[in-house]
């Protein structure tokens, strides 16, 4: 029986605790909702739930402190008052946000015995217990306070911090404005700030002054160039080298003192370098036109030299191939140049050299007459230089091989008209090689010159 009674008692206690927690949650929610509605109606702007909860919890904390540390005399009751609703309705632009002007004001009233303050449940939650009373909202009028009444204004802060400050009693009003009737329109002492003080009333707007006319721009004075630095002083003359020490000698007879005029003269100072005169620059500018004219004359001379070289190369190649082509059925053996590879090679190179020289001769004549070349300028110099180098190598190669073959024929069969005519053609090919070498130098100059 004892165990059953204890279990039943525990279940009843648990059910009562759950019922108390539910009632406490409902009362907290109802208190928060009522506070938000009344504060919104008073201030004209919505109030957040956390502000109401903060004020309610602060009142509970105050009740706990008063219960833990009782004071002699009447116990103050807590009244939650929104700070200056009349001012907020009249001048909404001059008030701070409503979250920073919710005030908690405690006034002392006579009470015979301290009433039990609301405490938190044993569950450790932040809600109000079952017997917590809903805090009333202050009306426009309130009962008179006793002579020893004090005023405690607690200002709710933002969600980061809160501050409380004791403010002495100033009037019998329970509103946040200690001077409600002065200045018209709900008092002129200002709002209670976060630290318990009052902010000053905003000054009347001043009439905007007309902007002064812009100052005229200042004239910029020309900057004077600093004078040129003085020339550096001449370097000091080197000290004369001391003569080598002379070994002591027997004393000589005393000589007359040397007059001061006979001493060595001091070295003359080195003259400072003279600044270049401005006419030197004009002299270099005057040399531009003669340089251009001399460049043109040099280019014309090079063209005439190249024209003569091309004509000579064409004539020599034509003579060499004609002599070698006529060397057929000559000598005692009735031999011909076409029977030998070296002679055919020399004949082909002379034909190519003749055709190329004629083409270059015609192109130079057109350039000198009409100032227009058959090949564009960027490619012309490279083409001339390459062809001159190749034909020069081919001429010296073919002439050398033909010379070796003629020497072999003379050594084996003796001298007759056939090798003699071949020797004549080879000699003319060597002369054509020399002319092509000169043409190669001219084309290299035209390719790599910088005055183009």
UniProtKB/Swiss-Prot annotation:
Record keyword Cell membrane present: yes
Extracellular side, ranges: 327-347, 407-423
Compositional bias of kind Low complexity: 105-126, 190-205
Region (Disordered): 1-39, 71-147, 164-283
Keywords from the named record: Cell membrane, Glycoprotein, Membrane, Transmembrane, Transmembrane helix
Pfam families per UniProt: CASP_dom
Family per record: Belongs to the Casparian strip membrane proteins (CASP) family.
Subunit text: Homodimer and heterodimers.
Stated name of the protein: CASP-like protein 4A1
Originating species: Sorghum bicolor
